[in-house]
Each structure stands twice: as C-alpha cells, then as structure tokens.
Swiss-Prot record:
Family that this chain belongs to: Belongs to the complex I NDUFA4 subunit family.
Record InterPro entries: B12D
Protein name: NADH dehydrogenase [ubiquinone] 1 alpha subcomplex subunit 4-like 2
Domain of life per record: Eukaryota
One Gene Ontology CC term in the entry: mitochondrion
Coiled coil residues, start to end: none
Pfam family, one: B12D
Length: 87
C-alpha cells in the first residue's frame, strides 16, 4: 500500500466503495462550475482591468444598455437611457 501510486489507491477505493462515484461526480461538477464562473467574472466584469494603459477605467466606457450582470430579472437593458455624465 505504501508503494502504490495515488491513482492506483484511488481506483481501489472506487472499486471497494462504488457509492462514492456520484459524490466525486458532483464535486467535479461543482469545481468546474466555480472555475467557469471565475473565468466569466475575469473576462466580462467591468470591475476587472486587464489593460491599464489603453483602458484604465473600463466601467466608464459601458453604455447604459450593456448587460454585465449574470441574471437580470426585471430589467430590460435595451430601453435604458444614459443618465450620467461623460468623464
């Protein structure tokens, strides 16, 4: 047991206890979903600035009808008007 690799020990545990297969699947699904959500936040959020030289304040370049929220229940972004000054 001490010389067995991690993959071999994992495979042996799966063979002994097949009831943990759904748990492993759900854990992998949760980790994948969290990674995809973090990637979405990093690429689409106006709070994240990747290019400080050309776009130092990306939140000022958003138009009122840009939807950056993940879920908007009752807001129709196509009908919004600009109500803030240009900087």
């Amino acid at each position: 047991m001490a010389g067995a690799s991690l993959g071999a020990r994992f495979y042996r545990q799966i063979k002994r206890h097949p009831g943990i297969i759904p748990m492993i699947g759900l854990i992998c699904l949760g980790m994948g979903s969290a990674a995809l959500y973090l990637l979405r936040l990093a690429l689409r959020s106006p709070d994240v600035c990747w290019d400080r030289k050309n776009n130092p304040e990306p939140w000022n370049r958003l138009s009122p009808n840009d939807q950056y929220k993940f879920l908007a229940v009752s807001t129709d972004y196509k009908k919004l008007k600009k109500d803030r000054p240009d900087f």
